């Protein structure tokens, strides 16, 4: 009887691991850096604040799902003028978190995030 229970627990653990792997595949860490016309700065900043953490002027970062990432890209494209503005997006898998080192003043310390 104990063997059957152990096998059952192992099957459940395997399913949980598969679900976790699927969820990780659906998520990523992004850093977005933008240089847009002054007339669009507040609009793009307000939009990105809804989805990511503000780091400093023109820089946002955070963990998002693939679906959220696509919504963010679509929102950015609706705001910017592609002939005049520039947005750079760095994507990282969740199992590879970039190391961040701050030189000088930290504009938005992580412990300020509620």
Swiss-Prot record:
Disulfide bridges in this chain: none
CDD domains: Cas2_I_II_III
Name assigned to this protein: CRISPR-associated endoribonuclease Cas2
Matches recorded under InterPro entries: CRISPR_associated_Cas2, Virulence_VapD/CRISPR_Cas2
Record keyword Nucleotide-binding present: no
Residues that hold Mg(2+) according to the record: 35
Gene Ontology terms, MF aspect: metal ion binding; RNA endonuclease activity
Membrane spanning stretches: none
The protein's role, per its UniProt record: CRISPR (clustered regularly interspaced short palindromic repeat), is an adaptive immune system that provides protection against mobile genetic elements (viruses, transposable elements and conjugative plasmids). CRISPR clusters contain sequences complementary to antecedent mobile elements and target invading nucleic acids. CRISPR clusters are transcribed and processed into CRISPR RNA (crRNA). Functions as a ssRNA-specific endoribonuclease. Involved in the integration of spacer DNA into the CRISPR cassette.
Pfam families: CRISPR_Cas2
Family per record: Belongs to the CRISPR-associated endoribonuclease Cas2 protein family.
The gene coding this protein: cas2
The protein's Enzyme Commission number: 3.1.-.-
Keywords (A to Z) from UniProt: Antiviral defense, Endonuclease, Hydrolase, Magnesium, Metal-binding, Nuclease
Organism: Methanocaldococcus jannaschii (strain ATCC 43067 / DSM 2661 / JAL-1 / JCM 10045 / NBRC 100440) (Methanococcus jannaschii)
Gene Ontology biological-process entries: defense response to virus; maintenance of CRISPR repeat elements
Gene3D superfamilies on file: 3.30.70.240
Assembly and interaction partners: Homodimer, forms a heterotetramer with a Cas1 homodimer.
PANTHER family associated with the record: CRISPR-ASSOCIATED ENDORIBONUCLEASE CAS2
